[in-house]
Amino acid sequence: MLIVKKFGGTSVANKERIYNVANRCVEEYKKGNDVVVVLSAMGKYTDELISMAEDINDKPPKREMDMLFTIGEQMSVSLMAMAFDKLGVPAVSLNAFQVAMHTTSVHGNARLKRIDTERIRRELENHKIVVVTGFQGVNKYDDYTTLGRGGSDTTAVALAAALHADACEIYTDVDGVYTADPRKVPKARKLKEITYDEMLDLATLGAGVLHNRSVEMAKKYGVPLVVRSSLNNSEGTVVKEEVTVERMLISGVALDTEAVRIAVIGLKDVPGMAFKLFDVLAKKHINVDVILQSIGSAGTKDISFTVDGKDLDDAIATLEENKARLGYQELHSERNIAKLSIVGAGMMSNPGVAAKMFESLYNEGVNINMISTSEIRVTVLINEKDGVRAMNAVHDAFNLAD
């Protein structure tokens, strides 16, 4: 069997944890399996690199930031390979250039295009554990790029797909996927399994266990995912196409406090205006989520939407640059908000799910500012100060602890 194992920064934060990961991988290796390990930067090292960069230049070029960021993962993989050597197991560390991990040229948020697996396969044939840098790639100009938030998850899934691995195991500081963040909802329960679609929505909406791009890729290529803890040997949660047990009405509740709302006031109420608005944002690679259009005054309309907090400055700058083309009157932004979502394939065949969610929020005195729905998701925008209380109320309303 070929197993890809990805470990995040907290899992390799110090010597003790590095050896904990190494011993776990050696156990797999000694079963006769091929092992590829994908690592993030150690602990909070990426934050340290950001601080160092901003001390030199408060607006550092994105290309140079990508070059700097690659140091973190390269440190992790080289130290891990040294740990394997100390344990008497042959291993080799490889960075994105050595693996030939080809990406687009969008610095800070590149997309993987293809992976040349020849080097990895050659090392596996030589009975080595292969330790690969997550989060990074190389563009057509041979410049380093980074894959953005959750990039190491994406690297692991992409490698698993390219190598036709038997499984891709994502190790975190929690032991699986829960019905809610157990740090915010003490009654949260671990799920044995969840569908790709449910996990994708939860990941997109704030559940930090897996990144949405990695789930998209796993679904596209049919990569079996397992989310497990790096600190214990519990079974974890399997993410797959279909669950084998009866679908739950609701699989989970997610809270995203990183979102911000932007309101574009006084747009002309004519065909194509929404397209023009979101097209200028798309060209800057800014993702929008919850969207609300309302009637303005005297032949105008207002459009509100949410973006990730890190994209706020770019979004505002882009809209201001295009004010003449868009013809809006005012621009407002709001930070102290939260997106609260419920996700579950079971809601497709059960009416009244949204009403039950709204009732639980009403009973808690939580005001809803915006609403967005899909077949398996309901999302509301609320005040950030109400977020955790609302999350627990909704979790209780759907009896997710049982």
What are these regions (language model features)?
Residues 210, 221, 232-237, 312-313:
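Surface-exposed amphipathic alpha-helical tracts and adjacent flexible/coil segments at the periphery
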Residues 218:
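Acidic-aromatic/histidine active-site loop/patch
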Residues 238-402:
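A conserved regulatory-domain signal marking ACT and ACT-like small-molecule sensing domains
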Residues 33, 89, 223, 286, ...:
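Short phosphate-binding/catalytic loops that engage adenosine nucleotides
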Residues 167-171, 225-227, 289:
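Short hydrophobic alpha-helical runs that function as membrane-insertion/retention elements
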Residues 1-215, 382-383:
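Nucleotide/pyrophosphate-binding catalytic subdomain
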Residues 39-46, 227-244, 299-300, 305:
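Terminal amphipathic helices with adjacent charged low-complexity linkers/tails
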